């Protein structure tokens, strides 16, 4: 893509925004290299990466800003030059970030990001050794080696001994009088005393320095000299040990230089994807549909650099028409519309989300050519018109079928009549090449050309006749008018002057104005008819909704009737069973009292009575099926006795709303909720006992130390849900102190839980700021 084209549609400004969104140095460098692509499959893949980046942003905790410019470090490693402690520590942080990023992305549903992180390199043992051996500023820790720790211990003890040897001069009054000041100074790593020059013989030792006036000599007493010499020896040994440690770590890192460099670059790629996602959030942008059919279909498109000031527009190019001519007055928003078309097309091809509806379709064009703005050149002695002509010449020579051409103020800068004629000829040439064109102009002749020519359409930016200002709204199919006479009339210019001006207009211009007026009239009539149809559709939908409500009410009534009949005949069935038992008991009694010969008669009598009961209490419906709840029905949770509303029903489970919580339960965990006061009274003691048991058995403390935020979230969620159902009023969650990441996650999460009343750090004797007490409603 021509760099000049990218600059004219302000694409570098978008790249600058993307650069700012990247955290790391490699990510920022990659952002500067983002350019439009031509392969639809690659573009689609880049857009899907941004989609994953948006999802990943919700979980991301790893800070990539530690990845600064490592080029000097990599150069030193390639030459096996010894690294400094700070450089080693920075490489350790790179490997740590690599490990954290790997595990963070591996736990989520990010297939494309996973393809990147599976190539990351990290050595956990090496990272631990580096963090054990170096402070962030690069100082080597005592724990780096036992030998270093021993030497530093000796150095510390020796320094104490030297200080004690010198301090005795401050403590003894006879010696203190020889000093200018009662303090100890350091000169060249040696402890010295500020001795008056006249008393130098009274403090035997080595003179290391003198004051500017010569009145003070800085003397190291002989009692401290031997210890000072020993200190120098120990410090040299310390330096040798540190150099050995630095060399060892340099060698370990150099062995993995190729993998480390690759990891650095891959983390930059991940950072770029996340930066694109951040930019999409800032611009309120969405993923466009990419196609190869050469159609541009913008829905609610906005210029990405105008923020809330941008007026959205709809535009489709390549279906009903291939050339669009936008007419209207200057400063009406024509150029902004043209730039919006260009920059959104390029952004989509660069794998960026665009500020437009997700229904927007971006067709791939071979090239995008642009002639926007004033390129008047003093050096080349070119006028505005000449510079436009040179651009147009280049476009006409290079544009091919399937390209997109954006032309601003076509036909201006010269005689209006000749300019319009030239503009028509240019458009005809491009139309013949089957090039897609969007051109802006305030030349009215081009509006007539659009009306008369096949696959050419007019558009205009709306003008408010009351405020006499443009609204920047785009209207497809409606040619624009200059509105000069209308504005003059609205501002109160004399009517005779307006009429005189009209008389100067040529007959062709008046005809053109009438043609535009007639088209506008037809457009208004069509819009009115469209509005009537829309209102009719709304009315039909309202009636349909009303009928659906009535059908739903009828269905509920039907179910209520069936329920009542079932209850009634269930009672009858119980009555049959009761009376049947009485008959059997009666028969048994008679069997005992009657003789054997009467047994047949008694059995026949029993059969007859059973038959009578069956006929009298025949059920008019099918046997009761196993309980299956309906959406909207109130049920009772078997385990806790709490009522809930059914939201959805599956094959053998239901989703219910219990208070402020949504639960997924099987049919055997719920039963119909019936308002039976007696049963409720009987159940009070039982329910209270159940709640008491659940409270007694519930663990009031949860430990999430050692987890990351992804692991901790479902554990905390389930724990709090169970605590709430059990009626627990207060729990304690132990998160530790550490980096503070778990505490931050927990407190952010608790703020969003509706049944959490409040939360705070635990008392000092119960964990302090390493634990959080949570109070439930």
Swiss-Prot record:
Intrachain disulfide bonds: none
UniProtKB keywords: ATP-binding, DNA-binding, Endonuclease, Hydrolase, Nuclease, Nucleotide-binding, RNA-binding, rRNA-binding
Binding site for ATP: 328-335
Pfam families associated with the record: MSSS, MutS_V, Smr
A GO BP entry: rescue of stalled ribosome
SUPFAM superfamilies: DNA repair protein MutS, domain III, P-loop containing nucleoside triphosphate hydrolases, SMR domain-like
SMART domains: MUTSac, MUTSd, SMR
Classification via PROSITE patterns: SMR (PS50828)
Keyword Ligase: no
Functional note: Endonuclease that is involved in the suppression of homologous recombination and thus may have a key role in the control of bacterial genetic diversity. Acts as a ribosome collision sensor, splitting the ribosome into its 2 subunits. Detects stalled/collided 70S ribosomes which it binds and splits by an ATP-hydrolysis driven conformational change. Acts upstream of the ribosome quality control system (RQC), a ribosome-associated complex that mediates the extraction of incompletely synthesized nascent chains from stalled ribosomes and their subsequent degradation. Probably generates substrates for RQC.
Record-stated family: Belongs to the DNA mismatch repair MutS family. MutS2 subfamily.
Record-given protein name: Endonuclease MutS2
Origin species: Carboxydothermus hydrogenoformans (strain ATCC BAA-161 / DSM 6008 / Z-2901)
């Amino acid at each position: 893509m021509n760099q000049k084209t990218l600059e004219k549609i302000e694409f570098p400004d978008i790249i600058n925004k993307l650069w700012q969104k990247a955290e790391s140095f490699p990510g920022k460098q990659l952002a500067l290299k983002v350019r439009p692509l031509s392969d639809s499959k690659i573009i689609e893949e880049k857009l899907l990466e941004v989609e994953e980046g948006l999802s990943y942003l919700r979980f991301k905790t790893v800070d990539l800003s530690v990845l600064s410019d490592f080029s000097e470090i990599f150069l030193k490693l390639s030459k096996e030059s010894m690294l400094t402690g700070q450089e080693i520590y920075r490489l350790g942080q790179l490997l740590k970030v690599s490990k954290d990023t790997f595990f963070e992305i591996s736990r989520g549903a990010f297939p494309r990001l996973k393809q990147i992180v599976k190539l990351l390199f990290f050595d956990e043992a090496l990272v631990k050794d580096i963090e054990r051996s170096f402070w962030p500023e690069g100082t080597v820790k005592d724990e780096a080696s036992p030998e270093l720790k021993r030497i530093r211990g000796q150095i510390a003890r020796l320094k104490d001994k030297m200080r004690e040897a010198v301090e005795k001069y401050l403590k003894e009054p006879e010696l203190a009088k020889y000093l200018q000041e009662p303090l100890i100074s350091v000169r060249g790593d040696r402890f010295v005393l500020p001795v008056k020059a006249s008393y130098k013989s009274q403090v035997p030792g080595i003179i290391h320095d003198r004051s500017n006036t010569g009145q003070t000599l800085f003397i190291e007493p002989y009692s401290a000299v031997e210890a000072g010499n020993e200190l120098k020896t120990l410090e040299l040994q310390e330096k040798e040990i540190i150099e050995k440690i630095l060399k060892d770590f340099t060698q370990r890192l150099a062995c993995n230089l190729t993998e480390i460099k690759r990891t650095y670059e891959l983390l930059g790629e991940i950072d770029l994807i996340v930066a694109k996602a951040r930019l999409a959030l800032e611009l309120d942008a969405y993923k466009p549909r990419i196609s190869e059919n050469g159609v541009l279909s913008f829905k609610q498109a906005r210029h990405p650099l105008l923020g809330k000031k941008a007026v959205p527009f709809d535009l489709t190019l390549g279906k009903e028409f291939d050339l669009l001519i936008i007419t209207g007055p200057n400063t009406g928003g024509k150029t902004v519309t043209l730039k919006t078309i260009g920059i959104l097309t390029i952004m989509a091809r660069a794998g960026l989300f665009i500020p437009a509806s997700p229904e927007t379709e971006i067709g791939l064009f071979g090239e995008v050519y642009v002639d926007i703005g004033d390129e008047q050149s003093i050096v080349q002695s070119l006028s505005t018109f000449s510079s436009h002509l040179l651009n147009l010449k280049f476009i006409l020579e290079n544009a091919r079928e399937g390209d997109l051409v954006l032309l601003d103020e076509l036909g201006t800068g010269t005689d209006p009549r000749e300019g319009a004629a030239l503009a028509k000829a240019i458009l005809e040439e491009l139309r013949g090449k089957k090039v897609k064109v969007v051109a802006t102009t305030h030349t009215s002749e081009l509006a007539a050309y659009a009306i008369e020519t096949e696959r050419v359409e007019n558009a205009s930016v709306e003008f408010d006749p009351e405020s006499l200002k443009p609204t920047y709204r785009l209207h497809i199919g409606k040619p624009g008018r200059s509105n000069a006479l209308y504005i003059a009339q609205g501002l109160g210019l004399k009517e005779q002057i307006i009429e005189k001006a009209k008389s100067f207009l040529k007959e062709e211009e008046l005809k053109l104005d009438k043609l535009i007026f007639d088209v506008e009239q037809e457009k208004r009539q069509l819009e009115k008819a469209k509005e009537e149809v829309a209102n009719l559709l709304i009315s039909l939908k309202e009636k349909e909704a009303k009928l659906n409500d009535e059908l739903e009410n009828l269905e509920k009534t039907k179910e209520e009737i069936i329920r009542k009949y079932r209850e009634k005949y269930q009672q009858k069935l119980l009555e049959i069973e009761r009376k049947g038992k009485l008959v059997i008991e009666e028969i048994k009694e008679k069997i005992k009292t009657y003789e054997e010969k009467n047994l047949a008669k008694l059995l026949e009598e029993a059969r007859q009575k059973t038959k009578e009961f069956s006929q009298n209490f025949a059920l008019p419906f099918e046997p009761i099926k196993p309980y299956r709840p309906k959406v909207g029905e109130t049920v009772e949770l078997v385990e806790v006795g709490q009522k809930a509303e059914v939201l959805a029903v599956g094959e053998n489970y239901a989703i219910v709303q219990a208070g402020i919580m949504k639960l997924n339960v099987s049919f055997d965990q719920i039963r119909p909720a019936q308002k039976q006061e007696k049963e409720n009274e009987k159940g009070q003691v039982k329910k209270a006992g159940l709640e008491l048991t659940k409270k007694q058995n519930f663990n009031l403390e949860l430990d999430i130390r050692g987890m990351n935020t992804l692991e901790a979230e479902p554990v905390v969620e389930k724990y709090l849900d169970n605590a709430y159902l059990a009626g627990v009023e207060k729990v304690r969650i132990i998160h530790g102190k550490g980096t503070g990441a778990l505490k931050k996650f927990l407190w952010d999460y608790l703020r969003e839980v509706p049944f959490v009343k409040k939360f705070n750090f635990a008392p000092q004797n119960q964990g302090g700021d390493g634990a959080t007490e949570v109070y439930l409603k």
